[in-house]
């Protein structure tokens, strides 16, 4: 080899000095001709070595597209649906406590010798915590990943169920319920915000409807399951004991389920391929503070500055609160008026299960309507198209309220108010599903934060209605208490029409819709 190298620079060779320099340059660049074979590595070997020494640098903004092979939307359908199914079960689990508390409330009152309003604080603080939690957990999951937030939250949720099962006084129980609400809220934020991680907008409707069905299933099943309260052998504490056992199961499940946040998944994929992704912040104090600022402010910023989120949140302040209003109305109507047993009155919640199942079965039609609108719009999806069916279904909301109000007593059969409640559940559930799809379509990079900003007014409304309903039913007949809310609900269809016809104009005022939000994420180059 030495003789070959020497011969390249020998005076006896006919090559000029310039040729010698060219060959030397070729040797340096790894592109020498066949006469340099054996002197250095082949091109492919050299290129591989250079890639190892100088990894390819890719900007994160080029990797958020669903066209990337590592994007969770490109995973096998069975894997994606398994993840959604497990997370929907988790939503049923965390909603169990707040919706099941009504069935054990009288036992808690007797245990601590407190009034109904004081005992209801356990429920209302749980609801309030469920509204505040997503304001921090939503943004945190948008930058830190879904999986770590899930695990830590469910761990805290499980621990404080122990505190609720073995409280020394009612104050401890109320505080523990608030913390349970905060920790359990991650299921609502992460599932609703995580579905767009796994499904494109054209097919996200069905998994989102499954999530809504899971919410209804938890709300319906909890009062029925906590009917064990009437059995002295088990008692009210078993609501929390069961939560502790199931919580341990979900902690194991979370360890197995993969991360779904696209930026996290794609970055890991590229790093494994030896590429450097620009824009990922380093772990220094400045970047940590930037992340803390994002986590603590983004949810509130979106709620207060995004017109579409603010208007939808105010709508759901009333609409979601109505569901807790009916939780209270069930007992004076079916237990006191129609003389049903406690279990019989609890079983009336099954009407909501039927209504939610019908919504789930209808969702493929809703998706077809959305795709048809997209085709008519030259392949561009309009989030407002999510409300097409709602233009008609939302009319069931006030109609069902009035039916319940004026037929919730003899001589009308007990089935009549159940039908009215079902009509409200169909309209309310469908509107909620449309809004969740609308928000995740409009804010793909901040879906968790958007859902969180939307849910805070919703849970504040539920907190308020949990106490207002107690006052109304104590001072008014059931008929006029529900009728009062029915007259207010007349405005619901007009609000939905506003979203459909003017939503695009309202979205135009936003600085966070679509990929515009990328510059606000706590990335290194922002």
From Swiss-Prot:
It is a multi-pass membrane protein. GO terms for molecular function: pyridoxal transmembrane transporter activity; pyridoxamine transmembrane transporter activity; pyridoxine transmembrane transporter activity; thiamine transmembrane transporter activity; transmembrane transporter activity. The chain crosses the membrane at residues 81-101, 118-138, 147-167, 173-192, 204-224, 238-257, 314-330, 349-366, 387-407, 413-432, 444-461, 480-501. PROSITE patterns: MFS (PS50850). Residues 1-53 are annotated as: Disordered. It is found in: Membrane. The keyword Membrane applies. GO terms for cellular component: fungal-type vacuole; plasma membrane. SUPFAM superfamilies: MFS general substrate transporter. Keywords: Membrane, Transmembrane, Transmembrane helix, Transport. InterPro entries: MFS (IPR011701), MFS_dom (IPR020846), MFS_trans_sf (IPR036259). Residues 38-53 have a biased composition (Basic and acidic residues). CDD domains: MFS_Tpo1_MDR_like. GO terms for biological process: pyridoxal transmembrane transport; pyridoxamine transmembrane transport; pyridoxine transmembrane transport; thiamine transmembrane transport; transmembrane transport. Thiamine-regulated, high affinity import carrier of pyridoxine, pyridoxal and pyridoxamine. Also imports, but does not export, amiloride and so confers sensitivity. Belongs to the major facilitator superfamily. CAR1 family. This is Vitamin B6 transporter bsu1. It comes from Schizosaccharomyces pombe (strain 972 / ATCC 24843) (Fission yeast). The lineage of its organism: Eukaryota, Fungi, Dikarya, Ascomycota, Taphrinomycotina.
């Amino acid at each position: 080899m030495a003789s070959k190298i020497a011969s390249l620079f020998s005076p006896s060779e006919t090559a000029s000095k310039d040729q010698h320099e060219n060959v030397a340059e070729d040797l340096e660049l790894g592109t020498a001709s066949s006469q340099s074979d054996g002197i250095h590595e082949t091109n492919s070997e050299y290129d591989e070595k250079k890639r190892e020494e100088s990894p390819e640098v890719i900007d994160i903004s080029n990797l958020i597209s669903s066209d990337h092979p590592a994007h969770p939307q490109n995973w096998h359908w069975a894997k994606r649906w398994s993840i959604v199914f497990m997370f929907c079960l988790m939503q049923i689990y965390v909603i169990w406590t707040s919706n099941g508390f009504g069935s054990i409330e009288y036992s808690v009152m007797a245990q601590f010798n407190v009034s109904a309003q004081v005992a209801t604080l356990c429920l209302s603080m749980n609801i309030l915590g469920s509204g505040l939690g997503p304001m921090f957990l939503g943004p945190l999951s948008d930058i830190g990943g879904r999986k770590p937030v899930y695990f830590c939250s469910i761990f805290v949720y499980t621990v404080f169920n122990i505190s609720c099962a073995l409280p020394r006084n009612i104050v401890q129980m109320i505080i523990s319920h608030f913390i349970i609400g905060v920790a359990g809220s991650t299921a609502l934020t992460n599932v609703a915000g995580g579905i767009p991680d796994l499904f494109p907008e054209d097919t996200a409707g069905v998994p989102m409807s499954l999530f809504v069905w899971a919410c209804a299933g938890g709300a319906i099943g909890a009062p029925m399951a906590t009917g064990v309260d009437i059995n002295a052998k088990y008692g009210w504490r078993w609501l929390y004991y069961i939560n502790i056992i199931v919580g341990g199961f979900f902690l194991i499940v979370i360890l197995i389920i993969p991360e779904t946040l696209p930026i996290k998944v794609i970055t890991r994929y590229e790093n494994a391929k030896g590429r450097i992704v620009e824009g990922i912040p380093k772990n220094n104090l400045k970047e940590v503070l930037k992340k803390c600022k994002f986590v603590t402010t983004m949810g509130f910023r979106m709620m207060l500055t995004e017109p579409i989120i603010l208007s939808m949140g105010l709508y759901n302040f009333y609409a979601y609160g109505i569901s807790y209003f009916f939780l209270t109305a069930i007992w004076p109507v079916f237990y006191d008026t129609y003389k049903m047993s406690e279990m019989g009155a609890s079983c009336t919640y099954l009407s909501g299960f039927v209504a939610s199942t019908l919504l789930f079965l209808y969702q493929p039609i809703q998706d077809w309507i959305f795709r048809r609108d997209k085709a008519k719009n030259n392949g561009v999806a309009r989030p407002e198209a999510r409300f097409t069916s709602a233009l008609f279904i939302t009319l069931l909301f006030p109609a069902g309220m009035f039916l319940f109000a004026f037929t919730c007593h003899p001589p009308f059969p007990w089935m009549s108010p159940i039908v009215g409640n079902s009509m409200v559940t169909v309209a309310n559930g469908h509107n909620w599903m449309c809004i969740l799809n609308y928000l995740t379509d409009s804010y793909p990079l901040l879906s968790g934060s958007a859902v969180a900003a939307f849910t805070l007014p919703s849970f504040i409304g539920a907190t308020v209605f949990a106490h207002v309903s107690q006052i109304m039913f104590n001072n008014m007949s059931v008929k006029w208490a529900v009728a009062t809310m029915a007259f207010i609900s007349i405005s619901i269809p007009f609000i939905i029409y506003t979203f459909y016809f003017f939503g695009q104009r309202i979205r135009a005022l936003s600085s966070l819709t679509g990929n515009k939000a990328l510059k606000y994420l706590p990335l290194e180059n922002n």
